[in-house]
């Protein structure tokens, strides 16, 4: 079996980042790659390396001003796509609005090849019906009755 090479781009995290979680998810993802017998690289440079899979934290939108960290994200995703390979994105915790950014239980979103429902694969074809119950318990969240006024998230 051929080993796959996975590169996580630490330079895709903004220099002014104050959340250790953003770089920690990249580091732990690479540790998991290595633990499963493949080659994992946590890359601090801004150049794009040869790989089978590129991983970024966050996303870059089409009309974003390309600061250095956003260029790394953009080029990592583009390079994989042009070569017929994949990108993994770790995007923000959906529950930051309620529990804050530094809650010890992080539920980040991971997707492949995009972050939108029409472009990304969230591997959600067979969801675990108990998963929401676990998240509610871990974060102390509860669903509220449907309402049509105010600010809300529809689940």
Model-derived regions: residue spans:
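Catalytic-core helical/loop segments in enzymes performing group transfer/polymerization on anionic/lipid-linked
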Residues: 1-154
